[in-house]
Curated annotation (Swiss-Prot):
Keyword vocabulary terms for this entry: Host membrane, Membrane, Signal, Transmembrane, Transmembrane helix
Source organism superkingdom: Viruses
Lineage: Viruses, Viruses incertae sedis, Halspiviridae, Salterprovirus, Salterprovirus His1
Residues in the signal sequence: 1-18
Cell compartments where the protein resides: Host membrane
Keyword Cell division assigned: no
Membrane topology type: Single-pass type I membrane protein
Protein name: Putative transmembrane protein ORF23
Keyword Isomerase listed: no
Transmembrane segments: 119-139
Length: 148
């Protein structure tokens, strides 16, 4: 029974993680306001020029990785690399002199402790192994019950 519960405790969270990546977040951000995307990764609108061009910086506080978009206009996007992972930044709208509507698309595990990406990228293998553990546990439990 314990083996079956162990298998279920791995499969269910694994299914949730597999359906959650990549993440998309759209929100309004004020110039020089820092917002957390996920884990230790934060983003900041560093400059809004003439209500047209926007510069955004993304930082991983854990390892100090930093990348910047350069100047983007409304409708443009840029791919930034943080800790080896790609974060897509798209400017949706410049609302006024210092407010910007931005869409971020990123892997769920960016900024998580090391090893998280291994779990999420190999989730299919983990689910197969956990299912095998559950089946073996069910067979073993059925065998033990039938002996009594």
């Amino acid at each position: 029974m314990v083996i079956i519960l162990l298998g279920v405790s791995i499969v269910v969270p694994g299914l949730f993680l597999a359906t959650e990546t990549p993440q998309t977040n759209t929100f309004e951000q004020t110039e020089l306001e820092r917002a957390t995307l996920t884990g230790e990764v934060s983003t900041e609108v560093t400059q809004v020029t003439n209500q047209e061009q926007v510069n955004i910086t993304v930082l991983n506080r854990r390892d100090g990785t930093i990348d910047s978009t350069g100047e983007l206009q409304v409708g443009e996007s840029a791919n930034l690399t943080i800790s080896g992972e790609t974060i897509t930044v798209e400017i949706i709208d410049v609302i006024d002199t210092d407010n910007v509507l931005v869409r971020y698309t990123y892997p769920l595990y960016v900024g998580w402790p090391s090893g998280a990406e291994t779990i999420i990228t190999n989730i299919a293998d983990i689910i197969i192994m956990a299912t095998a553990v559950m089946i073996i546990g069910a067979i073993y439990t059925g065998y033990k019950v039938s002996i009594k």
